[in-house]
Amino acid sequence: MATLIYVDKENGEPGTRVVAKDGLKLGSGPSIKALDGRSQVSTPRFGKTFDAPPALPKATRKALGTVNRATEKSVKTKGPLKQKQPSFSAKKMTEKTVKAKSSVPASDDAYPEIEKFFPFNPLDFESFDLPEEHQIAHLPLSGVPLMILDEERELEKLFQLGPPSPVKMPSPPWESNLLQSPSSILSTLDVELPPVCCDIDI
């Protein structure tokens, strides 16, 4: 019968190798097992052979395997990169110094001193005063709605008027008065409509 012997690598990935039982007992030459990428020669064992212990689950070993692989790759790649790094770092240092020198005068040009700024207040430039030619402060305009005067004679009438009072103002016709009858209110609302033309053919 053939038995399975698990050869565990150092990086944690279980490798399987099928070896005949009779081949081990008879000593059929040296068998080569690959461990960690290196070939090792192992002499055949004589005597009673035992089954290898069961391997751990692949998930846990796989995690360890990837970590070990990454460390192996970093160890392998560290050798040739060590020679290139000093020249690259020197280039970086020169670039950094050039950038630092160029950035200092650029900041002065981009941001002038704050003392040279004039504070801007929009209210300083907005004046709501009329010019002296059109001053109307001497007119009694309290309570007067906005009016557009076309002629000078209307302006003279305004000068002759006294201060406006709500008692003397006539009431508009659409305001309802409690003393008026409904018929009088309706008479104020009557509007003459054009006559109806019945001659139009439909």
UniProtKB/Swiss-Prot annotation:
Q: Where is this motif: D-box?
A: 61-64
Acetylation among keywords: yes
What the entry lists under InterPro entries is as follows: Securin_separation_inhibitor
Q: Where in the cell is it found?
A: Cytoplasm; Nucleus
Q: Where is this motif: TEK-box 1?
A: 71-73
Q: Which domain of life is it from?
A: Eukaryota
Query: What is one Gene Ontology biological process annotated in the Swiss-Prot or TrEMBL record?
Result: chromosome organization
- Tissue note: Expressed at low level in most tissues, except in adult testis, where it is highly expressed. Overexpressed in many patients suffering from pituitary adenomas, primary epithelial neoplasias, and esophageal cancer.
N-acetylalanine carried by residues: 2
Q: For this protein, what post-translational modification is recorded in UniProt? A: Phosphorylated at Ser-165 by CDK1 during mitosis. Phosphorylated in vitro by ds-DNA kinase.
Q: Identify the residue span(s) of motif SH3-binding.
A: 163-173
- Modified residues annotated as Phosphoserine in this record: 165
Q: Does the keyword Transport apply?
A: no
The short motif TEK-box 2 is annotated over 94-96
UniProt KW keywords:
Acetylation, Cell cycle, Cell division, Chromosome partition, Cytoplasm, DNA damage, DNA repair, Mitosis, Nucleus, Phosphoprotein, Proto-oncogene, Repeat, SH3-binding, Ubl conjugation
Notes on the domains: The N-terminal destruction box (D-box) acts as a recognition signal for degradation via the ubiquitin-proteasome pathway. The TEK-boxes are required for 'Lys-11'-linked ubiquitination and facilitate the transfer of the first ubiquitin and ubiquitin chain nucleation. TEK-boxes may direct a catalytically competent orientation of the UBE2C/UBCH10-ubiquitin thioester with the acceptor lysine residue.
Q: Which family does it belong to?
A: Belongs to the securin family.
Give the protein's biological function.
Regulatory protein, which plays a central role in chromosome stability, in the p53/TP53 pathway, and DNA repair. Probably acts by blocking the action of key proteins. During the mitosis, it blocks Separase/ESPL1 function, preventing the proteolysis of the cohesin complex and the subsequent segregation of the chromosomes. At the onset of anaphase, it is ubiquitinated, conducting to its destruction and to the liberation of ESPL1. Its function is however not limited to a blocking activity, since it is required to activate ESPL1.
What this protein is called in its record is: Securin
Q: Species name for this entry?
A: Homo sapiens
**Designated gene of the protein:** PTTG1
